[in-house]
């Protein structure tokens, strides 16, 4: 499994991408250096991604700050100590709160190893993650990208990526998930860097801030 560990890995991946697909060169020139955005694997990393889903970056960070315990990091055990209605105070949806509770229970019981899962091949890891109720392909893919450092993951169902790829490459219509997954094959084995590139395009050129993790 190719792993992204630092900014140099992102730069290397981008260099390879520009050789694989010259159409990306003007996009890369427009957006500048790509963000690393790595987080530690584990409950907090996955929880942050779930909190960030389908909300603006500012909203996600406000919710996340309210969730952080005063005396340390947000562990599965710490999450389970919150009172049952705490999700309302945090600003979470009930669905997200229920998903986080199920994940926290699995991690705390030892039945789910989120760090070890990152060491598995992408297909196997994605299968385990999406087997958790409330965790869909987007959440699983983004976790492997930003907490596992997997270099060859592309969340083709992400609407921001669909819009960005369609606009940046001058496509006649926004590509849907199946078409975008096929299109992204040319960017393997650095599809996670390609996703960073198009998310950066979405943020800087399309003036939107719904980027998966801060």
Question: What is the predicted function of each stretch?
Answer:
Residues 1-34, 98, 122-123, 137-214:
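C-terminal accessory module of base-excision DNA glycosylases/AP lyases that mediates lesion recognition
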Residues 4, 23, 27, 55-133:
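Alpha-helical ds-nucleic-acid-binding substructure associated with the helix-hairpin-helix region
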Residues 41-42:
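Short, contiguous, helix-prone interaction/anchoring segments in small proteins
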Residues 47:
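Phosphate-handling catalytic interfaces
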């Amino acid at each position: 499994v190719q792993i992204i560990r630092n900014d140099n890995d992102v730069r290397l991946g981008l260099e390879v991408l520009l050789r694989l697909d010259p159409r990306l060169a003007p996009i890369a020139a427009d957006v500048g250096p790509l963000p690393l955005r790595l987080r530690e694997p584990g409950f907090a990393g996955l929880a942050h991604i779930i909190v960030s889903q389908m909300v603006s970056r500012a909203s996600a960070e406000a919710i996340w700050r309210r969730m952080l315990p005063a005396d340390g990091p947000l562990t599965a055990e710490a999450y389970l100590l919150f009172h049952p209605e705490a999700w309302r105070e945090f600003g979470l949806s009930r669905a997200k709160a229920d998903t986080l509770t199920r994940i926290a229970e699995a991690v705390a019981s030892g039945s789910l190893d989120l760090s070890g899962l990152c060491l598995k091949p992408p297909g196997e890891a994605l299968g385990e993650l999406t087997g958790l109720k409330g965790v869909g392909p987007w959440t699983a893919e983004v976790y492997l990208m930003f907490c596992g450092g997997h270099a060859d993951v592309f969340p083709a169902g992400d609407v921001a990526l669909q819009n960005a790829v369609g606009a940046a490459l001058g496509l006649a219509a926004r590509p849907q998930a199946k078409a975008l997954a096929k299109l992204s094959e040319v960017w393997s084995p650095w599809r996670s860097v390609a996703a960073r590139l198009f998310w950066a395009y979405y943020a800087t050129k399309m003036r939107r801030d719904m980027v998966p993790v801060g």
